[in-house]
Each structure stands twice: as structure tokens, then as C-alpha cells.
């Protein structure tokens, strides 16, 4: 990805990767950048970080940008792994809406309501304990609470590509087949070709005003 190459040239180094994104750490070690060629959920995560900034229960967001074609990146404070039991306790507090997390829970509600209206493949709150991390000062923060239902989204490209074409503008998904897929492995070549052809045909029909 061009964004990763630019950051690498500036001295940033890759420190992790998953199915949707790679993570780089700044030369100072104080910042982390998450870079994805396609992540329709990331704008909602950035929205949450802004809305809930005053709670000090989300990372400090230094930058967030969507590029032409759909690539996205965010820069935030670098965080460190917390103990699994701490993450579980954090999510229990959210579920119970205990006083110390009430404002965060309300911010999550607002973002989730909007996301579910706009993105059919928006997943529920991801309660994986690893999504709670620790900042340098020791405080716990919620880092990656939302996710796209990837299997369902990509299956939709085979079953109903028009649904995807309508829900996600073409200019926001040009790189949707360039995901790192570090955990689940690469796309099946035949399935990928069928996905691409189906989506291209759907885009052509939309562009010509020929809606089914």
C-alpha cells in the first residue's frame, strides 16, 4: 500500500497485521498507525474516538483519513496489551453500564445506531478482551470495538453483488480484494474472479441506471 510505503520511508516500522489492516509504530515509539486498503467500519471507530475523547476510555486519535479508492488510516497513541481478565472486566462494565463507563456506552450507542442504518455488514460490539489495551500511564482503553462481518460481506458478492454495489460506493471499495488477510488466508482465485465480475456487472448496471 502506498500509505505504508510513505510511512516506512519516514522511519515507521510494521509491528503487526491482521485480516483487515497492518499496524506501524512511529520512530519515537509513541504513535501507532493502522493502515487498511478497505475497511468500511473504520470511519465509525474514528467517530467513536472523537465522541468519547472526554471519557479518557478510548485512544487519543491524532489523525484519521480516507483516501480515494477506500484506503483508510488512523494515527493514535501507541498502546500495550492488557491482561485478558482486564479486558473481560471492561466489557462486563460496559454491559452493566456502570457509572465509570456510562458516557462511553452512550457514545457507542450513538455510533452503532448510525452504522447499522448505513452499513448492512456492520457487526455487533466486538467483546474480544484483546480490544481493551493499556496506555503508557497504565489506564485501560477500548481500542477496536467495531468490525465488519467480512465473510457475510464477501459472500454477498457471490449471492447478491448488487446489494454491495448499492451499499458501498465504488470509490470506497476499489481495493477491497487487497486486504492483508494475515489470519484467514488469501481469497480463492476462482471465487475472487466471480466476485470481481459480479461486482463489475452490478456497477455497470448502476452506472447505466438499469436497476433490477
Locations of the language-model features?
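ATP-binding glycine-rich loop module of kinase domains
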Residues: 5-55, 59-65
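Conserved hydrophobic "DFG−1" position in protein kinase catalytic cores
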Residues: 25, 35, 75-78, 134
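Active-site ExK catalytic segment of metal-dependent nucleases
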Residues: 32-38, 77-79, 144-146
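Conserved structural core of kinase catalytic domains
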Residues: 37, 53-110
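Protein kinase catalytic-loop region centered on the HRD/HxD motif
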Residues: 113-122
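Catalytic activation segment of kinase domains across protein kinase-like and atypical kinase folds
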Residues: 121-179
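C-terminal catalytic region of ATP-dependent kinase domains
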Residues: 164-165, 172, 177-212
Amino acid at each position: 500500500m502506498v500509505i505504508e510505503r510513505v510511512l516506512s520511508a519516514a522511519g515507521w516500522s510494521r509491528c503487526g497485521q491482521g485480516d483487515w489492516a497492518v499496524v506501524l509504530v512511529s520512530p519515537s515509539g509513541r504513535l501507532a498507525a493502522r493502515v487498511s486498503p478497505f475497511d468500511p467500519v473504520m470511519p465509525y471507530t474514528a467517530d467513536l474516538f472523537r465522541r468519547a475523547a472526554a471519557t479518557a476510555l478510548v485512544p487519543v486519535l491524532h489523525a484519521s483519513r480516507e483516501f480515494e479508492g477506500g484506503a483508510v488510516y488512523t494515527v493514535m497513541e501507541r498502546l500495550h496489551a492488557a491482561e485478558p481478565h482486564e479486558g473481560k472486566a471492561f466489557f462486563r462494565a460496559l454491559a452493566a453500564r456502570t457509572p465509570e463507563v456510562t458516557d462511553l456506552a452512550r457514545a457507542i450507542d450513538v455510533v452503532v445506531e448510525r452504522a447499522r442504518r448505513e452499513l448492512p455488514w456492520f457487526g455487533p460490539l466486538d467483546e474480544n478482551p484483546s480490544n481493551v489495551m493499556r496506555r503508557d500511564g497504565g489506564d485501560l482503553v477500548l481500542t477496536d470495538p467495531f468490525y465488519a462481518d467480512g465473510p457475510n460481506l464477501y459472500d454477498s458478492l457471490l449471492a447478491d453483488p448488487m446489494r454491495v454495489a448499492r451499499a458501498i460506493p465504488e470509490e470506497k471499495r476499489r481495493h477491497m480484494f487487497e486486504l492483508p488477510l494475515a489470519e484467514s488466508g488469501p481469497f480463492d482465485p476462482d471465487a475472487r474472479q466471480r466476485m470481481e465480475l459480479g461486482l463489475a456487472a452490478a456497477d455497470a448496471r448502476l452506472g447505466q441506471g438499469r436497476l433490477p
